[in-house]
């Protein structure tokens, strides 16, 4: 599914009945959230609010409100095809040299895709068609949404933050929420382990007291947005990955006030800096847990330039108790994670992040168990292999005769194959999401692993139960007369 920018993608969605234009005036303060939430829960289309009250700029919401639209954004026709994206990422994470001519021929499609990695640098770009700087910078002209009644202030949610550490060629792209506190100031809420925050810390060490340049893209093309939330290998830039998804090189342009490169076709670009030591209290905000988070201090982003396209579109979302867009993204990206995990742990059969588990806080793994203690190895692997699962609190490991995506199966395995004392692993003092107020200390808490596999010798001293298996001859005889019985007619 080919598209060039966000506007191309919206045209594709509209052609397939996946976009609804709302002409009725609707307020970005709470009302858009209410409409978007009802629409998402019903599996409805992306929404383009053409007349937000008090603003001349339309608001796009629910862009990734169904797994199908996430797949479309990644250049695929359906969610199942995202396994192929995961296989490509697994290959790029640990590429294996061809073992011969036939193997080289088999790998040619992957190598061909890699050729689309480099970015294409432009001298001028649509995102710089209109420029505001100095006193003309006014973020209050943007239709920034207030999502929940007790939110502290309007909040930018889909901002693609672009940073670069002082000793790095590669830029980092991250999505961090940003609270509006003045006409030219936002609070950059990034956690200490995230790429943007790490770049900032390295900058402070290398250039003490100097301003840290930063840019934020709003309304980038879906491939670039999704590249920022996908487990891209450290050796691959998010722009390069977006090019792989799109099938064409990502076009970028140098910012006006710094050397950062931003998506050329983005709707809006915010350029500016973080002054070392300038912090502000952020929050509270309703979040993906279904609760308001605690107030905490984060750096202040001062905006010196706003550049944008003619007739720009403001892309936004809301987060709340699942289902919301992050939960839908989790369902779709789940399919990307499976091949990556399987490359490292071939014994894994399936991996599932239930959306009701707030996208990542609980994982179910099914595996082909091969030795005593094997389930615990996989459990530890899930927590440590990908950064995306650093905050996963619960990991349930089952045998391959269990359907990881069926709670009836999973609960049966837990209640019949587990001894709570023997098969529960508790790990204390581990990284935990700062939004998780259930942890005893902000950012630090425990994890639980549940080994719901059949136990091998060495794991138990008792004879293990024999599973009930139907007599196949009886099953065949009843199959032959089933329709004649007419039980459900």
Curated annotation (Swiss-Prot):
Q: Which pathway is it part of?
A: Cofactor biosynthesis; ubiquinone biosynthesis
Binding sites annotated in the UniProt record for Mn(2+): 172, 238
Superkingdom assignment: Bacteria
Membrane topology of the entry: Peripheral membrane protein
Identify which residues the record assigns to the active site: 287 (proton donor)
Principal location:
membrane
Q: Name one GO biological process term.
A: ubiquinone biosynthetic process
The alphabetical list of record keywords is: Cell membrane, Decarboxylase, Flavoprotein, FMN, Lyase, Manganese, Membrane, Metal-binding, Ubiquinone biosynthesis
Task: Provide the assembly information.
Answer: Homohexamer.
The similarity annotation says: Belongs to the UbiD family.
Provide the function of this protein.
Catalyzes the decarboxylation of 3-octaprenyl-4-hydroxy benzoate to 2-octaprenylphenol, an intermediate step in ubiquinone biosynthesis.
Q: What is this protein called?
A: 3-octaprenyl-4-hydroxybenzoate carboxy-lyase
What gene codes for this chain?
ubiD
């Amino acid at each position: 599914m080919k598209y060039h920018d966000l506007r191309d993608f919206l045209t594709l969605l509209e052609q397939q009945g996946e976009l609804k234009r709302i002409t009725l005036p609707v307020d970005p303060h709470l009302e858009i959230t209410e409409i978007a939430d009802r629409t998402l829960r019903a599996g409805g289309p992306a929404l383009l609010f053409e007349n937000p009250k008090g603003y001349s700029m339309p608001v796009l919401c629910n862009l990734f409100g169904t797994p199908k639209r996430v797949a479309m954004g990644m250049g695929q026709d359906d969610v199942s095809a995202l396994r192929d994206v995961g296989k490509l990422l697994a290959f790029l994470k640990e590429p294996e040299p061809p073992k011969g001519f036939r193997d080289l021929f088999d790998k040619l499609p992957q190598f061909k895709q890699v050729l689309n990695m480099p970015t294409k640098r432009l001298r001028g770009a649509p995102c710089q068609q209109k420029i505001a700087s100095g006193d003309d910078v006014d973020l209050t002209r943007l239709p920034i949404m207030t999502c929940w009644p007790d939110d502290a202030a309007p909040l930018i949610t889909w901002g693609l933050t672009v940073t670069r550490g002082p000793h790095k060629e590669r830029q980092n792209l991250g999505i961090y929420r940003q609270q509006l506190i003045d006409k030219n100031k936002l609070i950059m809420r990034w956690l200490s382990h995230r790429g943007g925050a790490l770049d900032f810390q390295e900058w402070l060490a290398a250039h003490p007291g100097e301003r840290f340049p930063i840019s934020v893209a709003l309304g980038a093309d879906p491939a670039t947005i999704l590249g920022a939330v996908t487990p891209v290998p450290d050796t691959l830039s998010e722009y390069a990955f977006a090019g792989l998804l799109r099938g064409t090189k990502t076009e970028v342009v140098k910012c006006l006030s710094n050397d950062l490169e931003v998506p050329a076709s983005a709707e809006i670009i915010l350029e500016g800096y973080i002054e070392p030591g300038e912090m502000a209290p952020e929050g509270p905000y309703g979040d993906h847990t279904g609760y308001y988070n605690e107030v905490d201090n984060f750096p202040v982003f001062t905006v010196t330039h706003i550049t944008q396209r003619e007739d720009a579109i403001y892309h936004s979302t809301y987060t709340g108790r699942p289902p919301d867009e992050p939960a839908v993204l989790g369902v779709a990206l789940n399919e990307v994670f499976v091949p990556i995990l399987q490359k490292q742990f071939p014994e894994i059969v399936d991996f599932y992040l239930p959306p009701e588990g707030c996208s990542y806080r609980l994982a179910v793994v099914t595996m082909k168990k091969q030795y005593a203690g094997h389930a615990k190895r996989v459990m530890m692997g899930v927590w440590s292999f990908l950064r995306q699962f650093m905050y996963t609190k619960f990991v349930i490991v089952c045998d391959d005769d269990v359907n990881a995506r069926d709670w009836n199966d999973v609960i049966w395995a837990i209640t019949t194959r587990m001894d709570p004392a023997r098969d529960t692993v508790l790990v204390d003092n581990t990284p935990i999401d700062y939004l998780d107020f259930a942890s005893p200390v902000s950012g630090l808490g425990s994890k639980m692993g549940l080994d719901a596999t059949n136990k091998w010798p060495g794991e138990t001293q008792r004879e293990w139960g024999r599973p009930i298996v139907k007599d196949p001859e009886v099953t065949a005889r009843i199959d032959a007369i089933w329709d004649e019985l007419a039980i459900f007619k």
